[in-house]
A protein has these predicted regions:
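Class I S-adenosyl-L-methionine
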Residues: 3-188
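C-terminal target-recognition/interaction regions appended to catalytic cores
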Residues: 139-328
């Protein structure tokens, strides 16, 4: 949510993340910058906030590609109906890129049908990973699993164990909940939990982050799997967000889903970045040397915010936490 109280919305402390973004652009002076946020900024009173943001970019010496666009990740092979506003800022005097054209679509089943059912493994009640061999056939899933090369991926190849299912800590449901999940038709919303049940040949609904601890630490509703009477795992959500299987998330479900829900789907981010590469005249080459994964300190995946700040030497209050309004 954005506050619009006061003379300038950008000056309101409740809008501090956007303020810090503009501050970093001013200080770092990149040639190009990209801003992504919810499409609600383009309608109603929030348009004022958007106008102020564009003015702030212009005052910092940047042109903004107009008209701005709301892009749907589903148009860029991400199996998720996720619409987000994108602003592209360009240092004045440099060429403006275009917004990316759609590249195609992927279905839910094409993304996650190969993943083993987490409920089969007792180990996943206490740990978020387990060793298991499984077959993957669809190109989208094969690329995310590292079994097939992606000609548009210029990142370092990763050397990791594709037969280890990670980020798959189980969620325990009551038998009553499982019966309700089973009885809910695919593509519909379960009436009690209000969880959306995935349709294998459709798209996932928007994966959201939920609220932080200052606002009650509520988990955003997680989709119900189309085949199994349970909500999706973090790994399944990651596939539905276009993250590769080598990418690890926080070991807890709450933090793992927040990391995914707060992020730009990699395939959508790549499409936007690709347009900037074109105007820069970049000719990318994929590195040959793989990065070896699997030998790091996995305890880092369990850190809370204060532990992570202490470990990396970052002040924990660099961006102040929101305080709850208890006077209600």
């Amino acid at each position: 949510g954005f506050s619009l109280i006061g003379k300038r919305a950008l000056d309101d402390p409740r809008n501090q993340l956007v303020f810090h973004y503009v501050r970093l652009v001013r200080e770092l002076q990149p040639n190009y910058c990209v801003f992504e946020n919810v499409p609600g900024l383009t309608v109603g009173p929030h348009q004022r906030f958007l106008r102020e943001l564009i003015e702030a970019f212009q005052e910092a010496g940047y042109d903004v590609l107009l008209p701005y666009r709301v892009l749907n990740a589903a148009d860029f092979r991400v199996p998720q109906d996720r619409r987000r506003l994108f602003l592209i800022g360009v240092k004045q005097g440099l060429p403006l890129p275009a917004y990316p054209a759609p590249t195609g679509r992927t279905t839910v089943a094409e993304a996650i049908d190969d993943l083993p059912d987490a409920d089969r493994f007792q180990e996943l009640l206490a740990s978020d990973s387990v060793a298991v061999a499984f077959d993957t056939f669809h190109p989208y899933a094969r690329r995310l699993r590292g079994l097939e090369s992606d000609p548009a991926d210029y990142s370092h190849p990763r050397s990791f164990d594709p037969d280890r299912l990670t980020s798959s800590l189980r969620t325990e449901h009551t038998e009553l909940s499982r019966r309700r999940f089973t009885q809910t038709p695919q593509g519909k919303v379960e009436s009690v939990s209000r969880f959306h049940k995935l349709a294998p040949h459709g798209l996932c609904n928007t994966l959201r982050a939920g609220t932080d601890s200052a606002r009650g630490a509520f988990t955003s509703p997680r989709p119900i799997h189309y085949r199994f009477p349970r909500v999706v795992t973090v790994r399944e959500a990651a596939r539905l967000h276009s993250y590769p299987d080598w990418f690890r998330f926080h070991a807890t479900k709450w933090h793992g889903f927040r990391e995914i829900g707060n992020s730009v789907p990699p395939l959508l981010g790549r499409a936007v970045a690709g347009e900037i590469m074109k105007v820069l005249g970049c000719i990318a080459e994929k590195p040959e040397k793989p990065l070896l994964l699997g030998h790091g300190n996995e305890s880092l995946l369990k850190f809370d915010m204060s532990e992570a700040a202490a470990y990396f030497g970052v002040p924990v209050n660099t961006i102040a936490q929101r305080t709850r309004n208890t006077a209600r």
